[in-house]
Amino acid sequence: VITAPQLRAARALLGLDQRQLAELCGLSVPTIQRMEASDGTVRGTVDSLMKLIDALERGGIELIGEGQISSGGRGVRLKSPAAPSEPGLP
C-alpha cells in the first residue's frame, strides 16, 4: 500500500517528473497524476500499482508502511547506496 504523499516524496527523491515516472512504470501521465492527487491511499488497478511500486523499488526507494519502525509514521527513504540502480534512474 502506498499513499499519495509517499508517491510524491518517492518521485522527488528520485528526481523524476511525472512523465519520467510514467515511462518507467509503463503507465500514462494522467494515471500518475490521478494517483498523486488521491486522498490518502493511492487508487488504481492491481497491475498499475504493482508496476508503480516495482519501478520505485528498482530506483532504490523503500516504502515505510504504517507500523514499521519510523518515528514519523508512513514515509519513504532511499535504500543504501550499495543497492543497484536501474538504467535511467539516479
Task: Describe each model-derived feature in a short phrase.
Residues 1-2:
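A detector for short, charged/polar N-terminal pre-domain segments
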Residues 61-90:
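Helix-turn-helix/homeodomain-like alpha-helical modules used for DNA recognition
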Residues 6, 31-34, 75:
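Residue-level recognition of specific faces of alpha-helices
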Residues 9, 23, 34, 54:
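DNA-binding alpha-helical recognition surfaces that contact promoter or target DNA
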Residues 25-26, 46-63:
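DNA major-groove recognition helix of helix-turn-helix/homeodomain DNA-binding modules
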Residues 7-20, 81:
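Short basic helix-loop element that most often maps to the first helix and adjoining turn
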Residues 26-44:
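Recognition helix of helix-turn-helix/homeodomain-like DNA-binding domains
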